[in-house]
């Protein structure tokens, strides 16, 4: 049997990023053949990734990469905030975002097939990262924003915004911050999706009818409720985050700025999360997983 030296373990660790003991075990099983050890580790990584795929990944980070008049927002999910802050996770997310922007690709399934600079596909890099970190990791969604001027704002790892606009740069930055804070649905009332307005109208009608008031009064109540809703979700009607005595529309007009569109991503939007376990339940789950 080939003797496993420290230099062999170091080389395998440098090439895979895995722990020393895991590298030594892989080399022992491969009788010192580094290439075979790497192949075996990849196979075990695929198995581990498949096993982890059932775990809910609702944490993670929003990554934004800009290239000229284009920028991409990418949400990459993991299971814990601890991993979201990990440098390996961050590097993976940035690499994926850069590759997706260069390819002009926003479909998650097609992003998985993209080739990276080291020759790996995004999916192969994801599997390797799952093996290294030990959590389910998923590239969930991506969106490209194009425009003459772009303003980018990130609130920590969890919220990212890109605004396409023309006009004053400081106002553009302020609007990006505002979108992060107030989460508007659309640039103006006219752009609010019809299905959202219809849903709000339906709710307002049900409430108004319960009042038992005449039909003409009910109609006014519904109109007022819908108008209030539009004031809350249309960007131009909201009170500006930097100066809450002014509406966004007034700020845009005063600075000669026009917002074409925006995209806001927040980590975990729409993902159903499991109820948090108690400490005792966490310990029991960990013991069960170790068996």
Swiss-Prot record:
GO terms for molecular function: translation elongation factor activity. InterPro entries: EF-Ts_dimer_sf, Transl_elong_EFTs/EF1B, Transl_elong_EFTs/EF1B_dimer, Transl_elong_Ts_CS, UBA-like_sf. GO terms for cellular component: cytoplasm. It is found in: Cytoplasm. It comes from the Bacteria. Its main location: cytoplasm. Residues 80-83 are annotated as: Involved in Mg(2+) ion dislocation from EF-Tu. Keywords: Cytoplasm, Elongation factor, Protein biosynthesis. HAMAP family: EF_Ts. Associates with the EF-Tu.GDP complex and induces the exchange of GDP to GTP. It remains bound to the aminoacyl-tRNA.EF-Tu.GTP complex up to the GTP hydrolysis stage on the ribosome. Belongs to the EF-Ts family. This is Elongation factor Ts. It comes from Acinetobacter baumannii (strain ATCC 17978 / DSM 105126 / CIP 53.77 / LMG 1025 / NCDC KC755 / 5377).
